[in-house]
Amino acid sequence: MLSKKNNLKHFIQSSGFCGPASLKIALSYFNKEFSEKKLTKLTKANRQFGTEHEGMIKAIKKINGYVFAKENSTINDLEYFIKKENLPVIVGWFDNDGDHYSVVSDINLKNIILADPACNQPKREIKRKIFPKIWFDFVGNKNQKVSWGWLMVIYFEKGKKFKIKGKYY
């Protein structure tokens, strides 16, 4: 579970803007406040196609943050960041309405616990055995490419390295 001193602040997204809203939630962990409108502009999100992974990464770079991102991630990768690094993890996954971003805040033996900007309550639980089946989203021109197991971790410590292979931005 993430540190109690730095709880995530839940935020309800505007329609189509789960990416900027998830960034807002994750940034609250670091006591960094940005409006959804500002993050929408930085990510270049739009209601029709949402937010590209690339836009999420560029937005964090523009506010002097760093990003670790990875495709084809595993539940063990999520556990590493939540339990060992004590960092929230943004994931792209497939909800009932389509592809969606949320912030993983905890993991236990049964569930993945999300701070989901589409939900009124601050925690949403998805069965651990179900999550890998829905952990995909659509990216690229007109959302024509499937991205499996994408995750993104924000941090503000220059030069930080993790024990998982992925891309640093």
How should each PLM-predicted stretch be described?
Residues 1-49, 95, 108-110, 156-169:
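Active-site-adjacent structural segments surrounding the nucleophilic cysteine of cysteine proteases
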Residues 22-23, 55-56, 113:
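Generic structural signal for hydrophobic residues
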Residues 1, 43-49, 83-86, 107-169:
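Noncatalytic regulatory segments and standalone regulatory/sensor domains
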Residues 88-91:
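A short, Trp-centered hydrophobic/proline-enriched beta-strand micro-motif
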Residues 72-73, 93-94, 116-118:
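Active-site-proximal beta-strand/loop segments in catalytic clefts of secreted hydrolases
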Residues 58-82:
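Helix-adjacent hinge/juxtasegments
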Residues 97-102:
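Short, surface-exposed coil-to-beta transition loops
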Residues 49-60:
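A glycine-rich, hydrophobic loop/mini-helix early in the fold
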